[in-house]
């Protein structure tokens, strides 16, 4: 079963469903939603993402994508409104069979982006999610040398996932870092 998960509507939704030739359709929305004629022909439905918290929205979208992947191939089509950017981010993070966007009512396939974070960097992010720590404390928690901690922190800071905390001694996770591990 090929399924399209989307926040699109109108011509863009119709064009995306034709381009992906899906049998299933899941429309994600945040509130008011008008059913389309297309839904009568495809299996699926609409899912309301009921949260103001972007991290929780990402977790919910991830659950939906992973649950849908169990039944076959998954494609994502999004626009820049509301859930669209989060849907794109999670689709790239989790990995889907194709990502599409709509530009001037034309459907454009986008390349999949890979968020390449090593296991050690992921451990550091998960620890910093719980509390801010110094490089020495991180080394003790992760059980690596302080030099390696600084190397990993530098890479994470360049990606915008970690920053020096207000005390300038400790490191803390950024909002982007929280999204990357959500």
Task: For each feature predicted by the language model, list its residue ranges.
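Long, low-complexity, Lys/Arg-enriched
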Residues: 1-73, 82-88, 92-182
């Amino acid at each position: 079963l090929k399924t399209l998960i989307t926040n699109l509507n109108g011509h863009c939704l119709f064009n995306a469903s034709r381009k992906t030739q899906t049998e299933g359709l899941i429309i994600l929305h945040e509130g008011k939603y008008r059913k389309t004629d297309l839904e009568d022909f495809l299996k699926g439905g609409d899912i309301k993402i009921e949260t103001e918290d972007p991290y929780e929205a990402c977790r919910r979208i991830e659950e939906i994508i992973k649950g849908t992947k169990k039944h076959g191939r998954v494609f994502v089509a999004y626009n820049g409104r509301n859930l669209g950017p989060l849907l794109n981010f999670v689709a790239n993070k989790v990995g889907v069979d194709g990502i599409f966007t709509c530009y001037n009512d034309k459907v454009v396939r986008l390349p999949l982006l890979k968020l390449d974070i090593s296991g050690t960097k992921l451990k550091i992010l998960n620890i910093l999610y719980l509390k801010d720590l110094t490089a020495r404390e991180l080394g003790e928690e992760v059980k690596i040398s302080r030099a390696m901690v600084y190397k990993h922190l530098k890479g994470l800071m360049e990606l915008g996932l970690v920053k020096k905390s207000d005390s300038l001694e400790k490191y803390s996770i950024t909002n982007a870092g929280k999204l990357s591990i959500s």
